[in-house]
Amino acid sequence: MIFATLEHILTHISFSIISIVIIIHLMNLLVYEIEELRNSLEKGMIATFSSITGFLVTRWISSGHFPLSNLYESLIFLSWSLSIIHIILYIRNYKNDLNAITAPSAIFTQGFATSGLSTEMHQPAILVPALQSQWLMMHVSMMLLSYAALLCGSLLSVALIVITFQKKTDFFLKNKNFYSLRKSFFFGNMEYLNEKGSILKKTSLLSFKNFYKYQLIQHLDSWSYRVISLGFTFLTIGILSGAVWANEAWGSYWNWDPKETWAFITWTIFAIYLHTRKNSKLQDQVTNSAFVASIGFLLIWICYFGINLLGIGFHSYGSFQ
């Protein structure tokens, strides 16, 4: 009873804090960037991380096993994973676009776990014999950490695609003002440039906007590649550890279970992303790789939630049913 009450308090504290963090982040983003608000945001994420950690430790002690036995616990752990990504970047003094993704993603997952699932699913589940293994912590934690990293990296790629394909992102050579300026240089007609003095001003403004968008695209691509590479590593470890665990439990490394199949498809898609991203011979490789990563975003949700909706296969223990 004491553990249940403590878990209830910790989940509501973490959800309340991260909700305030989101409000502060929106104020800092939409109104005016204030350093004090930014510091409050980071402290709020640390408090949220501490509360979720306290919940996981409490659930671990009360249940006697690592809290990854049902969908509710896995969602809480996913929220914890998103929080730790945010905090690690903050500790290393990285100011990047992941902050705008990790905090909302954490509140979404925790909010769904707290309010979207039935009360019965909040209770710790008794592990079936096949799950009573030390591989539970290794396999499931690696998979959820990979989901968190891959989701963040994929969302950065989606943002990159949106910015790239905006109608107003036509580069210098497609702009009429830049064409006029180019014409003046090509024909050496400096008088034309003097008569059209406003062209230089307009072109400079246009060049600045395009240069800013170019820098933003490169920044998003760089961080997307880093985070997806990390998530791909976790996913590989998770799949391999799951194969070893399956061999111990069922006598076979691979059974083409629905979740195993979709995990393999997800792994293949992100392997294609990494290959496309590293292959400099491909034209527009940034956009191509971002498109592949956006496909991976959908596959992650299918792999994580879709199989739970079906409630079939060896992984149906975490289903909604």
From Swiss-Prot:
- Asked if the record carries the keyword Transport, the reply is no
Spell out where the chain crosses the membrane: 12-32, 45-62, 71-91, 98-117, 143-163, 227-247, 260-277, 292-312
One GO BP on record is: cytochrome complex assembly
PANTHER family registered for this protein in UniProt:
CYTOCHROME B_B6 PROTEIN-RELATED, HEME EXPORTER PROTEIN C
Q: What does this protein do?
A: Required during biogenesis of c-type cytochromes (cytochrome c6 and cytochrome f) at the step of heme attachment.
Assembly state and interactors? May interact with Ccs1.
Q: Which family does it belong to?
A: Belongs to the CcmF/CycK/Ccl1/NrfE/CcsA family.
Q: What is this protein's name?
A: Cytochrome c biogenesis protein CcsA
Provide the species name.
Phalaenopsis aphrodite subsp. formosana (Moth orchid)
Originating gene: ccsA
